[in-house]
Each structure stands twice: as structure tokens, then as C-alpha cells.
Amino acid sequence: MTRSLSFIITLLLFLPQLQADVVARLVKVEGNVYFKRMGMETFSEKAKLGAAILNGDAIKVGETGFGAIMYLDDKTILKIRENTKFGFMETQNTRTVDLTHGTLLNTVNSEGRTKSFRIQTPVSVASVKGTQFAAIVSQTGVDQFIGKE
């Protein structure tokens, strides 16, 4: 009995560390939006409103899709336009969005942030402290960053 109880207590103590970290939620979904979960090969999971986004996940939005993501800690919002593919990477001090192609409209809050925010493209890296900006990467790899004053 004591051995079983010790096992259960140990399991409960380490269970949160065994689960992937939920970093954001999908707050809007229209059309073709798919997840590729960390460790998976394809974008096979159809995205649903309220879906948890885990560290290491990726999202692809098709020609007729749109989505919006809200980070749980600082309420930063990413609006995802059609034909966009990107991934999420979180470390202790940095939040990175790896934009392969497409358009992200970003509202990065400066209040409540504990991590730096970066957008990484095939040719550039942009880091912001709190602003609204768009990150655009064409299918040929040309990128643009457009900020709002």
C-alpha cells in the first residue's frame, strides 16, 4: 500500500513536466487551417476553435483559410492570412515564430511580457518589444516587415 501511494505521489509531482507546454490557443478559425504537431511529418490535424498550441507545433493555412492565435501569458495576437506556414518555438527567454511563407499580422503587447518576441524567416530575423507589425514572406523567399508607428 505504501509503495503504491509513493508511486502515485511521484507520478503526480512529475506529470506536468511530462506534458508539452501549451503556449497559445486558436481563437479564430476559418477555412483550411491545419496543425503539424511536434514529431509529426505532415499537417494532418484539422484545426478547431480553442485548440491548444504546444511548443514545437506548426500551422498551415490554405488558400481559403484564416486564423488567429492568442498567447496565454501576455495576450499577444497573431492573425494568420491565407497561404501561410509557420512554427512555434519557445525557450525560457525567447518566443520565436518561424515563418516559412505567408503573412502574419502581429499585435505584440509590451505589458506582461517575460520573453522577447522574434519572427524568423528564411533570410531574416526581427525582434520586437511591443508593437503592431506585419511579417510577409513570398513563396520565392522575399520577406518584408511593416511596422505601425
PLM segments and residue spans:
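Flexible, surface-exposed loop/linker segments and immediately adjacent secondary-structure boundaries
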Residues: 20-149
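Bacterial N-terminal signal peptides
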Residues: 6-14
